[in-house]
From Swiss-Prot:
Species this chain originates from: Chloranthus spicatus (Chulantree)
Protein name: NAD(P)H-quinone oxidoreductase subunit J, chloroplastic
Keyword Thylakoid assigned: yes
EC numbers on record: 7.1.1.-
InterPro entries recorded: NADH_DH_suC, NADH_quin_OxRdtase_su_C/D-like, NADH_UbQ_OxRdtase_30kDa_su, NADH_UbQ_OxRdtase_CS
Membrane topology type: Peripheral membrane protein
Gene name of this polypeptide: ndhJ
């Protein structure tokens, strides 16, 4: 079984892999980093005009990093908008994924947080810098192989 976007991508010979459907019937697609930007543009033109959320996670120590995009096709007069989840996996050594900021502006802070916490570089992002951690911070705190520095915060006693 294929979702509508997946069927459309197959029809137009665009490389992707269906990872199945979740409990709400939303299909998850796997896209290669080098194909992501063109498929993102195509998804927008197809009608996925809203990036509901973007997040990232570390699959396993030493494994791939994943950037996840939840897209929604919002149309006037439609009670159940069509949704799709897209996962882009990147190698840990040099995790680079094209930014979709220029397609969906809501990707701005979300991609920055994924960069800050996991070290995924989003190519062509206009302000890719740390958003939660200080600029001087070393490492990527949400990676499973991250080793926390040995320091203690001094707090007021009163």
């Amino acid at each position: 079984m294929q979702g509508r976007l997946s069927a459309w991508l197959v029809k137009h010979e665009l490389v992707h892999r269906s990872l199945g459907f979740d409990y709400q019937g939303i299909e998850t697609l796997q896209i290669k980093p080098e194909d992501w930007y063109s498929i993102a543009v195509i998804s927008y033109v197809y009608g996925y005009n809203y990036l509901r959320s973007q997040c990232a996670y570390d699959i396993a120590p030493g494994g791939l990093l994943a950037s996840v995009y939840h897209l929604t096709r919002i149309q006037y007069g439609v009670d159940q908008p069509e949704e799709v989840c897209i996962k882009v996996f990147a190698p840990r050594r040099n995790p680079r994924i094209p930014s979709v900021f220029w397609i969906w502006k809501s990707a701005d802070f979300q991609e920055r947080e994924s960069y800050d916490m996991l070290g995924i570089s989003y190519d062509n992002h206009p302000r890719l810098k740390r958003i939660l951690m200080p600029e001087s911070w070393i490492g990527w705190p949400l990676r499973k192989d991250y080793i926390a520095p040995n320091f203690y915060e001094i707090q007021d006693a009163h």
